[in-house]
Amino acid sequence: MIEVSRYLLPNGLKMLHHFDNSTQMVALNIIYDVGSKDEEPSQTGFAHLFEHLMFGGSVNIPDFDTPLQKAGGENNAWTSNDITNYYSVVPRQNVETAFWLESDRMLELNFSEKSLSVQKQVVCEEFKQRNLNQPYGDTYMLLRPMAYKVHPYRWPTIGKEISHIENATLEDVKTFFYKHYAPNNAILSIAGNISFEDAVRLTEKWFGSIPKRNIAARNLPEEPEQKESRFLEVYRSVPLDAITKAWHMCRRTDKEYHS
């Protein structure tokens, strides 16, 4: 059984800690409670766009990757319908570098037209590569709006239309950041060769002064029960025919989920 200790900062940041002295590394993972389901139907793909923008420099640090790499660390991130996840792994003696970097970009990004333009281009190319320029790439883009008629799960994480990313403005992304990125909307997990006392001390030092923000309660539309079969047939220039099926299932928190 993995032993996990918990700590809550006054600004609402939840911290989880697991001590492991079998390694000389420490991993910091931050989950923000924001995903593609929190986007407006006319501005899809923003959660994923932000995953990229978070590496474009913060208020006090112009380049995220360089200081982490100099400290012997590595990092990555991913976005889902429900959350956005960031992690860094560093040698234990350089762990404070990761705290410094993660806290600064939680505080505020270095919003600039240049960074936005670069990341928009990167995300648009990813959209084309994954969904438009390879066989079967648009399968789940077609499947999702069949499975969901009103819930925001009906569009993929990368976005419903490439134009939503192309048309994103600096004010749009600033609004999204201040709406969702805050200590009281995040969970910081720390695992590796660092004591609980040191983890608390560094969390308080680097994250404690970041003010909480007004995080509005979600009001997602409830998906009506599907009572009919749904079918779509499309023709593409692909090597072989393909059939894709999907079923609705219970919630992840239900006892039946793992059965």
Protein language model annotation of sequence segments:
Residues 23-25, 63, 68-70, 80-83, ...:
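Short, solvent-exposed loop/turn segments at the edges of secondary structure
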Residues 27-89, 155-158:
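M16/MPP (pitrilysin/insulinase) zinc-metallopeptidase core fold and M16-derived inactive scaffolds
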Residues 18, 33, 89-91, 126, ...:
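Structured loops at beta-to-helix junctions and adjacent beta-edge loops in soluble globular domains
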Residues 29-31, 145, 215-259:
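His/Glu-based metal-binding/catalytic segments typifying zinc-dependent metallopeptidases
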Residues 14-16, 27-31, 87-89, 187-189, ...:
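Soluble periplasmic/extracytoplasmic beta-strand elements of cell-envelope proteins
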Residues 35-38, 196-197, 251-254:
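Short beta-strands and strand-coil junctions in structured, solvent-facing domains, enriched
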Residues 2, 8, 66-216:
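Charge-rich, well-structured scaffold segments of protease-associated domains
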Residues 1-25:
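N- or domain-start disorder-to-order transition segments that initiate the globular core
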